[in-house]
Amino acid sequence: MARFEPYNYNNGHDPFFAHINQNPELINLDLPASTPSSFMLFSNGALVDANHNNSHFFPNLLHGNTRRKGNKEESGSKRRRKRSEEEEAMNGDETQKPKDVVHVRAKRGQATDSHSLAERVRREKINERLKCLQDLVPGCYKAMGMAVMLDVIIDYVRSLQNQIEFLSMKLSAASACYDLNSLDIEPTDIFQGGNIHSAAEMERILRESVGTQPPNFSSTLPF
């Protein structure tokens, strides 16, 4: 092995050359100068071969590199995890979307979601019922407004109820006084006997209940 005599740098200002003077065996000239491993590294005033383990001389550099690598890997894993979560969320939304949407061909200006469709069906049913009521109730028109139209319908129904009650009361009174099916009175008995008052009362009840003129018994009499 060829060795150079240490060059004496006695200036005392450069610790690099002072360390070389104290340790001349660090200089290795056996390796060819053209190879990258023949270069010497300097750390903390000491020359070392690039082929040797430099973890003792560069602990901060190695730890910094590992720390940066760990941070990069951690950030990359976080990004991948976040991207996978976003993709799963998007896939879940795509799978749930066809269940919520009702595929109905709507007209222009009309919505296609289920709530709007149900509301539209309800309004159509209400309009149909109102048209039926307009045909049944006299004096009921859609132009007068919903509230006024409902008031007219209510008044008409109440009037019908009152008429039904009144007619039922008159019919019950007439049936209580006279049983027309079992009435066995001759016309001669009515005018010859004392049943004239009863005949007049029967005519009055029939006129009120039926609304027509009762038959004239005197025209059928022979005298």
From Swiss-Prot:
Tissue and organ distribution: Expressed in leaves, stems, and flowers.
bHLH domain residues: 110-160
Domain of life of the native organism: Eukaryota
Chief subcellular location: nucleus
GO cellular component: nucleus
Cellular location(s): Nucleus
UniProt xrefs under PANTHER family: STEROL REGULATORY ELEMENT-BINDING PROTEIN (PTHR12565), TRANSCRIPTION FACTOR BHLH75 (PTHR12565:SF367)
Keywords: DNA-binding, Nucleus, Transcription, Transcription regulation
Subunit structure: Homodimer.
GO MF term list: DNA binding; DNA-binding transcription factor activity; protein dimerization activity
CDD domains listed in its UniProt record: bHLH_AtBPE_like (cd18919)
PROSITE patterns reported in the protein's UniProt record: BHLH
SMART domains from the UniProt entry: HLH
Start and end residues of each stretch annotated as Disordered: 58-100
Biological processes annotated in GO: positive regulation of brassinosteroid biosynthetic process; regulation of DNA-templated transcription
Stated name of the protein: Transcription factor bHLH75
